[in-house]
C-alpha cells in the first residue's frame, strides 16, 4: 500500500490546487504584516494628528471630569488664581471707590465754600450800594447798575463841590437838612438833565 501511495502519480490539477492553496497561506503573513503596519501607521497618524488638539481636548475633558485628581488640583489652582485675581480687582475697585467718594466730598465742600464766599461778597457789596443809592438823588426811570451808581455818585460829588464853591445856599436852607437835601436833589436832577449847573434856574 505504501508503495502504491508513493508511486501513485500526482495529477497536475491536484498539484496546481495544492500550490494554489499553499500560495495564499504563504502570502497571508506578509499581508497580515502589511495590514498591521498600516493599522499601526494609521493609529500613529491619528494619535499624532490629535496630539496637540487631542491633548488640549483631553485636558479640557479632564478638566470637566471631577474624578481625575491631577486635573482636579489644576482646576482648584486655576479657580484659586481666578478668585485671587477677582479679589485683587475687587480690592482695587474698593480702594478706587474709597478714593472717589472722598474726592467727590472734597469737591462738594469746595463748591459749597465757594458759594458761601460769593454770597458774602455780593452781600457786602450790595449793602453799601443800596445805601449809596439812597443818598444820591435818582430819577424814577433810573435802573442803575453798580458802575452807573458809582459814576452818578462821582457826578453828585462834583455837583456838591460846585454848590459849596458858589455859596448860593442861604442860611435858612442850610439850617434845615431836609429842605437842603430836597433842594439839592431837585437841583442835581435838573443838572443831570441839562448837563450843567445853572444857578439862575435854581432861583
Swiss-Prot record:
Record's compositionally biased regions (Basic residues): 34-43
Region listing for Sufficient for transactivation activity, in residue ranges: 162-192
Main location: nucleus
Annotated region (Disordered), positions in chain: 1-107
Gene Ontology BP terms: cell differentiation; developmental process; muscle organ development; negative regulation of DNA-templated transcription; regulation of transcription by RNA polymerase II; rhythmic process
Localization: Nucleus
Pfam families the UniProt entry points to: HLH
Top-level division of the source organism's lineage: Eukaryota
Biased composition (Gly residues): 46-65, 80-100
GO cellular component terms given for this protein: nucleus
MF terms (GO), sorted A to Z: DNA-binding transcription factor activity, RNA polymerase II-specific; protein dimerization activity; RNA polymerase II transcription regulatory region sequence-specific DNA binding
Biased composition, class Low complexity, residue ranges: 1-18
Residue ranges of every copy of the bHLH domain listed in the record: 109-160
Keywords recorded for this protein, A-Z: Activator, Biological rhythms, Developmental protein, Differentiation, DNA-binding, Myogenesis, Nucleus, Repressor, Transcription, Transcription regulation
SMART domains: HLH
Function text: Acts as a transcriptional regulator. Inhibits myogenesis by sequestrating E proteins, inhibiting trans-activation by MEF2, and inhibiting DNA-binding by MYOD1 through physical interaction. This interaction probably involves the basic domains of both proteins. Also represses expression of pro-inflammatory cytokines such as TNFA and IL1B. Regulates cranial suture patterning and fusion. Activates transcription as a heterodimer with E proteins. Regulates gene expression differentially, depending on dimer composition.
Record note on quaternary structure: Efficient DNA binding requires dimerization with another bHLH protein. Homodimer or heterodimer with E proteins such as TCF3. ID1 binds preferentially to TCF3 but does not interact efficiently with TWIST1 so ID1 levels control the amount of TCF3 available to dimerize with TWIST and thus determine the type of dimer formed.
Name of the protein in question: Twist-related protein 1
Organism ancestry: Eukaryota, Metazoa, Chordata, Craniata, Vertebrata
Gene designation: TWIST1
Amino acid at each position: 500500500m505504501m508503495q502504491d501511495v508513493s508511486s501513485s502519480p500526482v495529477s497536475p490539477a491536484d498539484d496546481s490546487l495544492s500550490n494554489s492553496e499553499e500560495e495564499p497561506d504563504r502570502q497571508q503573513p506578509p499581508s497580515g504584516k502589511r495590514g498591521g503596519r498600516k493599522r499601526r501607521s494609521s493609529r500613529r497618524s491619528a494619535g499624532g494628528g490629535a496630539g496637540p488638539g487631542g491633548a488640549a481636548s483631553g485636558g479640557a475633558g479632564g478638566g470637566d471630569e471631577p474624578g481625575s485628581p491631577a486635573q482636579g488640583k489644576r482646576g482648584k489652582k486655576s479657580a484659586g488664581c481666578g478668585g485671587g485675581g477677582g479679589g485683587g480687582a475687587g480690592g482695587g475697585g474698593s480702594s478706587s471707590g474709597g478714593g472717589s467718594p472722598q474726592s467727590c466730598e472734597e469737591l462738594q465742600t469746595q463748591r459749597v465754600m465757594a458759594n458761601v464766599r460769593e454770597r458774602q461778597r455780593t452781600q457786602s457789596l450790595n449793602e453799601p450800594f443800596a445805601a449809596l443809592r439812597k443818598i444820591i438823588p435818582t430819577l424814577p426811570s433810573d435802573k442803575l447798575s453798580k458802575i452807573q451808581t458809582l459814576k452818578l455818585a462821582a457826578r453828585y460829588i462834583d455837583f456838591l463841590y460846585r454848590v459849596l464853591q458858589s455859596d448860593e445856599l442861604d442860611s435858612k436852607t442850610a439850617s434845615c437838612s431836609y429842605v437842603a437835601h430836597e433842594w439839592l436833589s431837585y437841583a442835581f436832577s435838573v443838572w443831570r438833565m441839562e448837563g450843567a449847573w445853572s444857578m439862575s434856574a435854581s432861583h
